[in-house]
């Protein structure tokens, strides 16, 4: 199984976001890896430990195909999107998330329909009682269920399959609603 994008940007570098990045690195998945956190010191720490290529929250524009994963608290989706909105090519991006609660995300997507057209909702059933980047775990998603749903309800769309392949490469079992 191979990925159809060359870059990944994880926005939110806590337990889940950090674990995504650590898994990519340990499995040697061939991606250019970027990360941002609402706390720029966390972004710098992720760079210092070798999880991401960028050194701070100032990204160059990613021109090639990119998966952007929002792994911030769901109430912070608007702020997180503002942080990255100039960092990607609109024609070559797919968005997904790791939120368990989708209500704030759906509100955001209703008022940002262009983003919604490129969004696949993800809910990894994985976690820990611990939080923060310091607790990342490359096995967090192994054999764990990830539930996917296209914003438009189309189960056969290409974006959905690309996100499904991504989670499967991380070791997850994927189901589509």
Language model region names:
Residues 1-59:
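NAD(P)+-binding Rossmann beta1-loop-alpha1 motif at the extreme N-terminus of oxidoreductases
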Residues 6-7, 32, 92, 118, ...:
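Residues at the starts of beta-strands that form the adenosine-phosphate
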Residues 34, 56, 120, 175-177:
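General small-molecule cofactor/ligand-binding pocket signal
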Residues 38, 72, 98:
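Short beta->alpha hinge that forms the Motif I/post-I loop of the SAM-binding pocket
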Residues 41-42, 76, 102-105:
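Conserved short alpha-helix immediately C-terminal to the canonical SAM/SAH-binding motif I
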Residues 60-94:
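Rossmann-like NAD(P)-binding element
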Residues 83-134:
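Rossmann-like NAD(P)(H) cofactor-binding subdomain of soluble oxidoreductases
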Residues 141-177:
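Internal alpha-helical scaffold of NAD(P)-dependent oxidoreductase catalytic cores
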């Amino acid at each position: 199984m191979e990925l159809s994008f060359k870059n990944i940007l994880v926005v939110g570098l806590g337990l889940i976001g950090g674990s995504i990045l650590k898994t990519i690195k340990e499995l040697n998945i061939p991606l250019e890896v970027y990360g941002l956190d609402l706390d720029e010191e966390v972004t710098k720490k992720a760079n210092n430990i070798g999880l991401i290529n960028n050194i701070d929250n100032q990204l160059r524009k990613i021109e090639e195909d990119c998966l952007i994963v929002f792994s911030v608290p769901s109430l912070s989706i608007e702020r997180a999107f503002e942080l990255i909105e100039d960092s990607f090519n609109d024609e070559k991006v797919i968005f997904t998330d790791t939120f368990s609660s989708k209500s704030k995300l759906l509100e955001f997507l209703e008022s940002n329909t262009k983003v919604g057209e490129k969004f696949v909702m993800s809910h990894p059933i994985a976690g820990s009682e611990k939080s923060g980047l310091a607790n990342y775990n490359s096995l967090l998603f192994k054999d764990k269920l990830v539930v996917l749903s296209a914003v438009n309800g189309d189960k056969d769309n290409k974006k959905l399959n690309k996100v499904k392949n991504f989670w499967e490469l991380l070791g997850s079992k994927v189901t589509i609603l």
